[in-house]
Structures are given as C-alpha cells and as structure tokens.
Curated annotation (Swiss-Prot):
Protein name per the record: Acyl-homoserine-lactone synthase
InterPro entries: Acyl_CoA_acyltransferase, Autoind_synth_CS, Autoind_synthase
Signal peptide: none
Keywords from the named record: Autoinducer synthesis, Quorum sensing, S-adenosyl-L-methionine, Transferase, Virulence
Gene designation: expI
Organism: Dickeya dadantii (strain 3937)
A Pfam family annotated for this UniProt entry: Autoind_synth
Entries under PANTHER family matching the protein: ACYL-HOMOSERINE-LACTONE SYNTHASE, ISOVALERYL-HOMOSERINE LACTONE SYNTHASE
GO terms of biological process kind: quorum sensing; signal transduction
UniProt enzyme class: transferase
Catalytic reaction list: a fatty acyl-[ACP] + S-adenosyl-L-methionine = an N-acyl-L-homoserine lactone + S-methyl-5'-thioadenosine + holo-[ACP] + H(+)
Length: 212
C-alpha cells in the first residue's frame, strides 16, 4: 500500500523532517546538482517553516516521495528565489498555493515498489486532491524543462504562464497546475492501469493506493 497524506511543518517530527531533508539532498544536490544549501547531509531552506505543508508518500514506513506547499500570500520560491530569473514575473491573482521541492526517491521506489510504479502519478493526483480539499483556485510552480515534459505526459492539463532562465542559463517555466475534473480523472485512469486501485478510492486525501 502506498499512502500519501498532508502534514504541516509544525506537526512534523524531527525524525521525519530530517528524513525529508536528507532525501531532498539526494535528489536536488547529488543527482540534479542544483544550487541548494546543504548542512549535515540535508537540504532545507528558509521556506521550510510554519507556513509550509508537505505531502508525504510513504511505503512500509519509509518516505518515498514528497512535495512542499506554501500559500502565495506567504514568502515562497516564486516571489523570492526564482523572481529574478524572469523578466517581469506575471503572477496570477487568486487563492493559489505554490508547490516546490517535488521529488520521488528513485532508489527507495525501486527497492520498495519496483520499476513499474505509480509514485509520481499518485503524487501529482494527491496535489490536485489537496488543492480541492482546501478550496484553492489551483497550484503555481516553477519547473525545469524535464519536469515540464513529465507533467505534460501525465495527462495533467497544465499551462505555461511564463518562461525564464535559471542561474545555469537553462529554461525554466512558471506553470499553472489546474484542479479540474479532466486532469484529475486523466491521472486516475493512468494510476488504475498499474495498481489495484478503484477510481473512487483515488479522489480523497489521505490517498491510499493498493499496489498491483
């Protein structure tokens, strides 16, 4: 069983925070070589604070995937870290949340689930379910070109708001991730193909996915 649930920074145990931060270091520093701050084998920044909520994907008690949410009214990576990478950033008005630090740990997924796994798709779906549960207008995020491709292939009806250049002079994109029914059920259809889940099981949060 793969379980994905939301938990606020303030309610996270130190052990779970350390686990998330260590996994993030493995993804963003070791594998992707992003310019991130790492201390004692962990990656974290000023946006990991009392305004932050995490989605955690857990299999057999171990975190295998996660994403970070911050309401746009609070300091976040779009209005902070990434702002200068765009020429006059055009941020939509509305009740949006920002997502960042999306990762699926390849080694843990391979060991706990196998190569044919729904972790990435399920985390995408959990993001939609979270935004709908708490009545947000949608999700805003900044992604690299490979992540843009992954999102497009998932069936999520994303839209590009603006293109910028990272510190490495690589294309990055400000995206709107909608929470519409069509996107939701496109993801659900793909997940049910490779798991034992029924469609009606996949519209909630926490999200429980029986694996094939």
């Amino acid at each position: 069983m793969l379980e994905i649930f939301d938990v606020s920074f303030s309610l996270m145990s130190n052990n779970k925070l350390d686990e998330v931060f260590a996994l993030r270091k493995g993804t963003f520093k070791d594998r992707l070589d992003w310019t991130v701050n790492c201390i004692n084998g962990m990656e974290f920044d000023e946006y990991d604070n009392e305004h932050t909520t995490y989605l955690l994907g857990v299999k057999e008690g171990k975190i295998i995937c996660s994403v970070r949410f911050i309401e746009m009214k609070y300091p976040n990576m779009i209005t902070g870290t990434f702002f200068s990478y765009f020429d006059g950033l055009n941020i939509p008005e509305g009740n949006y949340i920002e997502s960042s630090r999306f990762f699926v740990d390849r080694d843990r997924v391979r060991n706990l689930i196998g190569t044919r796994n729904p972790a990435c798709l399920t985390l995408f779906l959990a993001m939609i379910n979270y935004a709908r549960k708490y009545h947000y207008d949608g999700i805003l995020t900044i992604v690299s070109h490979p992540m843009l491709t992954l999102l497009k292939r998932s069936g999520w009806r994303i839209s590009i708001i603006q293109q910028g250049l990272s510190e490495k002079q690589e294309k990055i994109y400000l995206l709107h991730l909608p929470t519409d029914d069509e996107s939701r059920y496109a993801l659900i259809e793909r997940i049910t193909r490779i798991t034992n889940a029924e469609s009606e099981q996949l519209t909630t949060l926490p999200l429980l996915v029986p694996l094939a």
